[in-house]
Amino acid sequence: MANGRVVQVMGPVVDVEFDRGHLPAIYNAIKIQHKAQSAGERDIDLTVEVATHLGDNLVRTVAMSSTDGLVRGMEAVDTGAAISVPVGAITLGRVFNVLGEPIDLQELGQVDRRDPIHRKAPEFVDQATTVEILETGIKVIDLLAPYIKGGKIGLFGGAGVGKTVTIQELINNIAQEHGGISVFAGVGERTREGNDLYHEMKDAGVLPKTAMVFGQMNEPPGARLRVALTGLTMAEYFRDEEGRDVLLFVDNIFRFTQAGSEVSALLGRMPSAVGYQPTLATEMGQLQERITSTKKGSVTSIQAIYVPADDYTDPAPATTFAHLDATTNLERSIAELGIFPAVDPLASTSRALAPDIVGQEHYDVARSVQKILQRYKELQDIIAILGMDELSDDDKQVVGRARRIQRFLSQSFHVAEQFTGNPGQYVPLKETVRSFKEILEGKHDHLPEGAFLYVGTIEEAVEKAKKMA
């Protein structure tokens, strides 16, 4: 292990000088530790990661926590390896930071194995080639944009349309119905939300099946850039060593890009389009290519994607799009109608929505639902100008069914029970397809539209209509 010394501190970027022939490799972790000498000082225990070699035996590093109190001349020790984090059963039910240190005020105990956060993606020969659907119990997702085991799913939406709540519901449903292991990576989001999620999962009893890793908004960009890799490394262990199907939740993948942009600017790289880092596509690819199904198990990733100013052409969401198997688009106009989850049934897509994967019946029902909703969208201008009376009888029927379908796509969430007062619903895929098929066939045209709002199956809508009568 080589020793060096700090020669320059620029916010979260630290330059360290080493002796000739002892330069640490790129991605190596370097420890800077210093005991307080006087009452006003604080102990320093900082890990930095090597980002570039500057020449003249200097390396430029990025700090994983605050650099407050750091001064030139402090000793820095090269650990000789990349940042390594605990993996395995010891991580379940616990909350970690980017370095794999517990932040839930409990002792970690004996760590049997640590894995480096920088690893290669699985080889092509190791990857699985079959496509299997992952049932979520959320009607609009299962019907119109089904998720794939081992796939990458993007949850798109602007501020405040329900990305985090939808992610919380998915964690809950997968844990309760499938008994699956989840890893949650909180990347650059609100600490309050992370705290709420921890307590909600504890109360719901799903925490023992979940590992949580946080690098939140208040942390330096180095931590926010690497925390997604920490979570992914924990998930990969369960896939590769235990052959499990793991869910990796990333909230929010945009903050990963944003942190990369900050680090890139601090390292002095020339910015690219809209001020993003020139290495945007490479960084995203290195993360996303590790998320896949192998012959042993799978890592299915659900990533919340903040869309800056609702602009889908922004380089950050646009780069992420290229890696996704399914997209769930949350739309503000649907949220304003009071319909949650506010999923846009026409903009959300999945490559699994094909007859040879989901079956002919499911495919036909899903496409018919989209066809009716698309026709309703086209008629809205006419309705706004001339009113419903000017429509043909066929179009009036389409509008009536579309409005019922639109409301039936809403659903009460388990994680929102305390706010809404409505018990959450998990709707099996078979029930979802059957219920929508009945609406399409016109069996329930006589029921009031309000009966379809926040119910699970079609039978619940019929019961609700009786109560409303």
Curated annotation (Swiss-Prot):
What are its GO cellular component terms? plasma membrane; proton-transporting ATP synthase complex
**Protein origin, superkingdom:** Bacteria
Enzyme's top EC category: translocase
Residue positions annotated to bind ATP are: G157, G158, A159, G160, V161, G162, K163, T164
Could you tell me the keywords of this UniProt record? ATP synthesis, ATP-binding, Cell membrane, CF(1), Hydrogen ion transport, Ion transport, Membrane, Nucleotide-binding, Translocase, Transport
Catalytic activity from the UniProt record = ATP + H2O + 4 H(+)(in) = ADP + phosphate + 5 H(+)(out)
Compartment annotation? Cell membrane
- Its Enzyme Commission number(s) read 7.1.2.2
Q: Does the keyword Lipid metabolism apply?
A: no
| GO MF annotation list | ATP binding; ATP hydrolysis activity; proton-transporting ATP synthase activity, rotational mechanism
Coiled-coil intervals in this record? none
Topology within the bilayer: Peripheral membrane protein
Query: What Gene3D superfamilies is this protein classified in?
Result: 2.40.10.170, Bovine Mitochondrial F1-atpase, Atp Synthase Beta Chain, Chain D, domain 3 (1.10.1140.10), P-loop containing nucleotide triphosphate hydrolases (3.40.50.300)
The record's annotation in HAMAP family points to: ATP_synth_beta_bact
Matching PANTHER family: ATP SYNTHASE (PTHR15184), ATP SYNTHASE SUBUNIT BETA, MITOCHONDRIAL (PTHR15184:SF71)
What biological function has been recorded for the protein in this entry? Produces ATP from ADP in the presence of a proton gradient across the membrane. The catalytic sites are hosted primarily by the beta subunits.
NCBIfam families assigned to the protein according to its UniProt record, in alphabetical order:
atpD
Per the record, the similarity remark reads: Belongs to the ATPase alpha/beta chains family.
Subunit structure, briefly?
A: F-type ATPases have 2 components, CF(1) - the catalytic core - and CF(0) - the membrane proton channel. CF(1) has five subunits: alpha(3), beta(3), gamma(1), delta(1), epsilon(1). CF(0) has three main subunits: a(1), b(2) and c(9-12). The alpha and beta chains form an alternating ring which encloses part of the gamma chain. CF(1) is attached to CF(0) by a central stalk formed by the gamma and epsilon chains, while a peripheral stalk is formed by the delta and b chains.
The name on file for this protein is ATP synthase subunit beta
Lineage, highest ranks first:
Bacteria, Bacillati, Bacillota, Bacilli, Bacillales
Q: Which gene encodes it?
A: atpD
